[in-house]
Every structure is written in structure tokens, then in C-alpha cells.
Design a protein with these regions (language model features):
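Amphipathic alpha-helical interaction segments
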Residues: 1-187
Length: 187
């Protein structure tokens, strides 16, 4: 059995179709849909995952994403609630992805508008939110690379990083990519 069939067996064709149709529940971080998406992400080729998430980043409404990551909007702070170095991990991955993209303020994080601190271990949730918003709006490929790395290395952080709407977009894109690839592979 090939990788695609292994993934289909683990996730289930019905779950993939549910993701593709945008009918998954990403409201609750512990939902079965969230766990299935994390499993799919862990099994994907990192480059394919990065490409799909970069395309998804371009579809995320910038205001909706900003509202998700900005501390205090809607009385939430999803990045600030992360424990065990999760915030610093997201900050380091984002900054590294932007530096690798190598253009504009991304290669010089101190030039990101409003950013107070560029040391990932000392950044607060507001600083990480500024970097995330900047990456999502200005460098979607770097944002996709960061999301892929976070999703594969620390999948539990992905919901706080992306938010439910972006998770739903990513799940639909990943399922569509997987279903398309499955149709191309020999049975």
C-alpha cells in the first residue's frame, strides 16, 4: 500500500470529503476533525504541505486573521495562552521563515511595523501577532512554510497560530490536494 492509501486508511475518505467541503469542526481544539487534520499534516510531504498552506494563506481574510491573533480582540489571546515555550517556538519559526524569504522587513524583523522585540524567547503575544500578520499579508509563502513546520513539529500549536477559519481553509485545501494526488496515483 502506498503513502496516499495509508493516509486515506488512517484519516478516512469520508473525513477527507468533509474537509474538502468545508464541513469540519475547528471550533474546539480537541475535536476529532482537529485531530484528523493534525494526523494528515504529520504524514504529508513537507514541501507539498508548505505549498498548499502558502496557497491557503493567500485566501485567508487579513482582517479575520488579524482579529484572531491580536491579543484582546474578542476578549481572546490564543497566542498568549500557549504554554511550555509554544509562543517562542511559533515566533522562532515565523522569523526564520521570513529571514529565508529574504526580502523587505522580513529579512530585517526590526522593520516590521510596530514590532517591539525581535528575540523569539522574549517576544510577547502582541509581538508574535505582529510578525504573523505581517507574514500572512506580505509573505504568504513564508507564512505557509511556517505553518507547515509548526504543523509537523508541534501540531498542537497550529490551532492557536492559524485560528478556526484558517484551519478550515487549510483543511479544505489539503483534502483537495490529497484527493487530486490520490486520483493520479496507480491503484
Amino acid at each position: 500500500m502506498g503513502l496516499l492509501q495509508d493516509i486515506a486508511a488512517a484519516i478516512g475518505d469520508d473525513k477527507l470529503k468533509q474537509f474538502q467541503q468545508g464541513e469540519a469542526d475547528f471550533e474546539d481544539q480537541g475535536s476529532s476533525d482537529q485531530k484528523a487534520l493534525q494526523d494528515l499534516i504529520k504524514r504529508m510531504n513537507p514541501k507539498d504541505l508548505q505549498d498548499v498552506l502558502a496557497k491557503s494563506a493567500k485566501q485567508i481574510d487579513p482582517q479575520e486573521y488579524s482579529d484572531h491573533v491580536t491579543p484582546g480582540v474578542g476578549d481572546t489571546d490564543p497566542l498568549g495562552q500557549l504554554k511550555g515555550g509554544g509562543l517562542a517556538s511559533i515566533a522562532a519559526v515565523l522569523l526564520n521563515s521570513l529571514k529565508q524569504a529574504g526580502s523587505g522587513a522580513g529579512s530585517q524583523p526590526s522593520k516590521i511595523p510596530g514590532l517591539q522585540n525581535t528575540d523569539p524567547s522574549a517576544m510577547n503575544s502582541g509581538d508574535v501577532a505582529k510578525v504573523a500578520r505581517y507574514a500572512q499579508e506580505n509573505h504568504p509563502d513564508a507564512f505557509g512554510k511556517a505553518a507547515a513546520e509548526i504543523g509537523q513539529q508541534q501540531p498542537g500549536l497550529l490551532h492557536s497560530f492559524l485560528g478556526k477559519s484558517a484551519m478550515a481553509l487549510a483543511a479544505a485545501a489539503l483534502a483537495s490536494h490529497f484527493i487530486k494526488m490520490d486520483r493520479k496515483s496507480p491503484k
